[in-house]
Amino acid sequence: MKIDKKSLKRIVKVLLNKVPKEEAALIKVSDDLTLIQEIYRKDKDFRNFILNPSAPYEDKKKIIDSLSEKAGLDPVVKEALEYIVKTNKGNLLKIIGDEFRFEVEKFFATVKGEIITAYPIDEETINSVKEVVEKKLGKKVEFDIKQDPSIIGGIIVKAGSYILDSSLKTYLQKLEQQLTAF
């Protein structure tokens, strides 16, 4: 089922207008939407039920009420979920968290990123990478630091649309492609 981008943007805009423009409130709604998105992606039964047009809205609403209560969802998120389900646009749940987070990042002029290394790195290195990326993007960047021994060495930096992969693993893969091309 194709994603209706127009509806997605409209729903995200309504959410942004209903949520107080305070960092804590926006982060709470963003986290709630990300949780819903993850449940939608990982729980096949939930996804199939939400997408089933012949399932009565009242039954879907009961699931939303239960989920909202258990997860402590913000009332604005619950209201948006009910609207999405009522209008049979359940497939929007696949990306609504990403879209909302993108709009919040634009609002705060911040970008979420990640630094991936094979081994632990010190604060000084993190700060220098952060400084370079912020200068390049012209926005504040908040990095999650991850370790992935499979990259062997080097660093991978992702922030918004900016990706720098100087890992040894990627270098070796490119070298292998060049050598086997002959």
Swiss-Prot record:
Taxonomy, superkingdom: Bacteria
| Transport found in the keyword field | yes
Q: Which GO terms describe its cellular component?
A: plasma membrane; proton-transporting ATP synthase complex
Alphabetical UniProt keywords: ATP synthesis, Cell inner membrane, Cell membrane, CF(1), Hydrogen ion transport, Ion transport, Membrane, Transport
Record membrane topology? Peripheral membrane protein
Q: In this record, what's one Pfam family?
A: OSCP
| Compartments, as annotated in UniProt | Cell inner membrane
**InterPro entries membership:** ATP_synth_OSCP/delta_N_sf, ATPase_OSCP/dsu
Major localization listed first in the record, in broad terms? membrane
- GO: which molecular function terms? proton-transporting ATP synthase activity, rotational mechanism
Q: Which family does it belong to?
A: Belongs to the ATPase delta chain family.
Q: How does it assemble?
A: F-type ATPases have 2 components, F(1) - the catalytic core - and F(0) - the membrane proton channel. F(1) has five subunits: alpha(3), beta(3), gamma(1), delta(1), epsilon(1). F(0) has three main subunits: a(1), b(2) and c(10-14). The alpha and beta chains form an alternating ring which encloses part of the gamma chain. F(1) is attached to F(0) by a central stalk formed by the gamma and epsilon chains, while a peripheral stalk is formed by the delta and b chains.
Function, as annotated, reads:
F(1)F(0) ATP synthase produces ATP from ADP in the presence of a proton or sodium gradient. F-type ATPases consist of two structural domains, F(1) containing the extramembraneous catalytic core and F(0) containing the membrane proton channel, linked together by a central stalk and a peripheral stalk. During catalysis, ATP synthesis in the catalytic domain of F(1) is coupled via a rotary mechanism of the central stalk subunits to proton translocation.
Read off the PANTHER family from this record. ATP SYNTHASE DELTA CHAIN
Protein name per the record: ATP synthase subunit delta
Provide the species name. Answer: Persephonella marina (strain DSM 14350 / EX-H1)
- GN (gene name): atpH
